Curated annotation (Swiss-Prot):
Annotated organism of origin: Aspergillus sojae
GO cellular component: extracellular region
Family, as annotated: Belongs to the peptidase M28 family. M28E subfamily.
Summary of pH dependence: Optimum pH is 7.1-10.
Function: Extracellular aminopeptidase that allows assimilation of proteinaceous substrates.
An annotated Gene Ontology molecular function: metalloexopeptidase activity
Protein name: Leucine aminopeptidase 1
Keyword Protease: yes
Length: 377
C-alpha cells in the first residue's frame, strides 16, 4: 500500500481497530482514492476533492477489513446463466411496471430540502422512504417480506428490503438515497432527482412488481432477493461499506449485486447525436456478472448498451467489490453524457426522462427474477 504524506500514523492506529469499530474524527478522514492510494484530509478537503470530481472510499477506521475482503474475493466463483430462462414470466411482469409510479414517489422524495446523510433531512427522508417500502409490502400480502433500517454512525439509515427465498444465497439490487449540494453540503438545496432519486424509484417499482409474482411472494424462489437503499454514498460509500463489511463478517452468501445510480438523464446522449443507451460500467465490477447483465438488457430492454468506465469508488457497487462480492453497475448513459446538474440545486425532476427510467426498471426486474430462480449459483 502506497501512503501519501501524514498517513502512516493514522493508518497504524486504524489497523489496530476491530472490524466495524468506526472511530470518527471531526478533523481528519482517511480516503482511498485508488488501490493502495490513501490520503488524510479534513472534512473541507474531502468535499473539495468531490467538487473536483474525485471519487473515493472513506475508509476511516476500516483498514483492518481490507485483508479479509481480499481473502473472501479469492474464494468466490459464481457461474451465471448464459441465456435468460424465464422470458415469458418476466415479460408479463414488465407489463406491470407503471411509469407513473416513478414520478409519484420521486416528486415528494426530491422535495426534501436535501437528503444529506448527516442531517435531520437525511434521517427524515430515510424514514419516509421506509414507509413507502412498507406500504408496498403490506399491499402485496407477501409472505415473510420485510424492510429494516440499517443504522450507521450518522443520522441517516440505509434500508434493506428482503424477499426470502428457499436458500440464503442472496441477490442484491442497490441504489443510494442520500443527496448533496457540493457548494454547501449540510445546508444547500439538493433535490437529487437523478442522483440518485431515479435509481431509488427504479428499484422500488421493480420491488413492487416482483412481489406480484405468486412464487416470489410465497418465498418459493430458490434464492433470496434484497433491495438496498444506501445512506451516505456521497460521503465516500459509507452506508454500503458498513453493510458489505457486516455481510463479510457474517459470511453472507451474496451471489450478485447490481447498482443503479442515475437512471434518468438522456439529453446529453441525444444532444451528442448518440442513441439512447444503458451504460454498462466495466471497471471495479465482476466481469462474468457484467456479461450476464448485458444478456438481461438484450432480452428485456428496447435500447442497446454502451460500455463505459466510472473510476475508482464511483458508486456503491464498489463496496460490494471491495468486500469480495460480485457486482455490476448499470448507468443512464456513457460517462461524459450523464447529467451535468448533479450535486446542485438544479438536479430536479424536470431533468428526468421517465421512459429511460422505465428501461432501467425492465432490466432490474429481469435481473432480479432470473437470478432469484437460478438454481446453479
Amino acid at each position: 500500500m502506497r501512503f501519501l504524506p501524514c498517513i502512516a500514523t493514522l493508518a497504524a492506529t486504524a489497523s489496530a481497530l476491530a472490524i466495524g469499530d468506526h472511530i470518527r474524527s471531526d478533523d481528519q478522514y482517511v480516503l482511498e482514492l485508488g488501490p493502495g492510494e490513501t490520503k488524510v484530509v479534513t472534512e473541507a478537503e474531502k468535499w473539495a476533492l468531490r467538487a473536483e470530481g474525485k471519487r473515493f472510499f472513506d475508509i476511516t477506521g476500516r483498514t483492518s477489513s481490507l485483508e479479509l475482503a481480499s481473502n473472501k474475493k479469492q474464494k468466490l466463483a459464481v457461474t451465471y446463466p448464459d441465456s435468460v430462462q424465464h422470458n415469458e414470466t418476466v415479460q408479463n411482469l414488465i407489463n406491470s411496471l407503471d411509469k407513473k409510479n416513478f414520478e409519484t414517489v420521486l416528486q415528494p422524495f426530491s422535495e426534501f430540502h436535501n437528503r444529506y446523510y448527516k442531517s435531520d433531512n437525511g434521517k427524515k427522508s430515510s424514514e419516509w422512504l421506509q414507509g413507502k417500502i412498507q406500504e408496498i409490502i403490506s399491499a402485496s400480502g407477501a409472505k415473510g417480506v420485510t424492510v429494516e433500517p440499517f443504522k450507521h454512525f450518522f443520522p441517516q439509515s440505509s434500508l434493506i428490503a428482503k424477499i426470502p427465498g428457499k436458500s440464503d444465497k442472496t441477490i442484491v439490487l442497490g441504489a443510494h438515497q442520500d443527496s448533496i449540494n457540493l457548494n454547501s453540503p449540510s445546508e444547500g438545496r439538493a433535490p437529487s432527482a437523478d442522483d440518485d432519486g431515479s435509481g431509488v424509484v427504479t428499484i422500488l417499482e421493480a420491488f413492487r412488481v416482483l412481489l406480484t409474482d405468486e412464487k416470489v411472494a410465497a418465498g418459493e424462489a430458490p434464492n433470496t432477493v434484497e433491495f438496498h437503499f444506501y445512506a451516505g454514498e456521497e460521503g465516500g460509500l459509507l452506508g454500503s461499506q458498513d453493510i458489505f463489511e457486516q455481510y463479510l463478517q457474517k459470511s453472507r452468501d451474496v451471489k450478485a449485486m447490481l447498482q443503479q445510480d442515475m437512471t434518468g438523464y438522456t439529453k446529453g446522449t441525444t444532444d451528442a447525436g448518440k442513441p439512447e443507451s444503458i451504460g454498462i460500467i466495466t471497471d471495479n465490477v465482476d466481469e462474468n456478472l457484467t456479461k450476464f447483465l448485458k444478456i438481461i438488457v438484450d432480452a428485456y430492454c428496447t435500447i442497446p448498451t454502451v460500455d463505459s468506465k466510472c473510476g475508482y469508488g464511483c458508486s456503491d457497487h464498489a463496496s460490494a467489490t471491495k468486500y469480495g462480492y460480485p457486482a455490476a453497475f448499470a448507468f443512464e448513459s456513457a460517462f461524459g453524457d450523464d447529467s451535468p446538474y448533479i450535486h446542485s440545486a438544479d438536479d430536479t425532476i424536470e431533468t428526468v426522462n421517465f421512459d429511460h427510467v422505465l428501461q432501467h426498471g425492465r432490466l432490474t426486474l429481469g435481473f432480479a427474477y432470473e437470478l432469484a430462480f437460478a438454481d446453479s449459483l
